[in-house]
Amino acid sequence: LVKNPTRSTIDKKLAEIEKNTKKFTSIKKNLRPNITSTKFLKLLSDIEHIAEKSSMIGGYSSLRYSENTQSDEATSLLMRISKFNSEMENKLLFFDLWWKKQIDERNAKRLIKSAGQFSEYLKFKRLLAKYSLSEPEEKIINTLDVTGASALVKLYDKITNAFVYVVTVNGKKKKMNREQLTTLVRSNKAKIREAAYKSLFSKYNENKGVTGEIYQNIVQNWSDEGIG
């Protein structure tokens, strides 16, 4: 992205992505099955550029969050970027669905033939057509991916990464975080591994009410979306 990005830097990156997305959406009313290969390739290149920039900033926010899941600043940034990327994805969704469901087979084959490095990607997209919903429905799912299951996973991370484990090593009780306990799980001494696992599982057992509720709601979310 850039070295030590500030909020101002991130705002500029987001503004650039939003500007390019808005520009791309202007082609919606002019999409036709008989579009020339040259114009089609230009559209693919444009949307690839937007996706690349969105992925970079999304990756940065995820890494910041992974570095310290207890950081309110990192959590806020991740949620902000996730919401922004979801909104941009929804604005570009029309092109994805147009390619999957609205263009006839003859023109699709014609465009795939001249698509070069995008050919296999385009073929794969066509295979997904029968599993795609309407644009309003797909937009709802994209939004729920940020505010629904994804938000629950972040909550789970915050809870479990804050766990403090008490384990007895060589007759001495020690307090450890998850990363420190993991080193004992891989110990070459069976008794130490056993003590580490017991400490790990006991902590999850103590919190089974809240973590179990999170699991159930995530699975229910998948079921509601027709995944499970």
Which residues does each PLM region occupy?
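A well-structured
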Residues: 1-228
